[in-house]
Amino acid sequence: MPFIENQTTTAEPIVPVDVKGKDAFHKLVDDLSAVLGPSSGLDSDDVDPKDIQKLMEGYVSNHEEWQRYALADESRAYTRNLVDEGNGKSNLLILVWNPGKSSPIHDHANAHCVMKILHGSLKEHRYDWPEQDKINNGEACPLTVTKETILRENEVAYMSDKLGLHKISNPDPNDFAISLHLYTPPNAAHFGCSLFDEKTGKSHHIKQCTFFSNRGLKL
């Protein structure tokens, strides 16, 4: 399903197009950018995530439309592949999850995250924030799981720092999972995010969440 690094193709796949010449996936990309506005400034309070969720829910996944962006690397847990930057207001990514692998527990750098499953399924573990007083005093504050959810193909989920922390994993030991993520504003790419230890609650900041590819080209 995904393009493994060093894999080559001999021809572009044939995909259905609408009357304007764009397939449904690329029309979704344009529509998401339009919702975020052409030029005005943006912070996370200016966006209604329900509008983004509605657009993503309306798209039925077709791998021929997005496969060119789904670059995989078997040496890492998952890859983050940039599809679009939404007039500078967001990052739209396709993440390719290797079988049985997961993300660290992380925050979202004060941004909205809307996620759609394009292929396979993903499991979300959601956590409460650790008690900062305990962390500041050098005490362990194990993270508490508040919710576990299995997300299947074409399902959409929303996450933000107001809802806590989370970890995403691919529960299938044999197959890739592939998901579409929209982050707005694109804070993690610009400023980094924080990763958390489940047993202690302690965090460390990573300066930048890097991309594996940009619009189908490996970086």
Swiss-Prot record:
Binds 1 Fe cation per subunit. Disruption phenotype: Leads to hypersensitivity to L-cysteine. Abolishes the ability to grow on human hair and nails as substrates. GO terms for molecular function: cysteine dioxygenase activity; ferrous iron binding. The keyword Protein biosynthesis does not apply. Pfam families: CDO_I. InterPro entries: CDO_1 (IPR010300), RmlC-like_jellyroll (IPR014710), RmlC_Cupin_sf (IPR011051). GO terms for biological process: L-cysteine catabolic process. This is Cysteine dioxygenase. It comes from Arthroderma benhamiae (strain ATCC MYA-4681 / CBS 112371). The lineage of its organism: Eukaryota, Fungi, Dikarya, Ascomycota, Pezizomycotina.
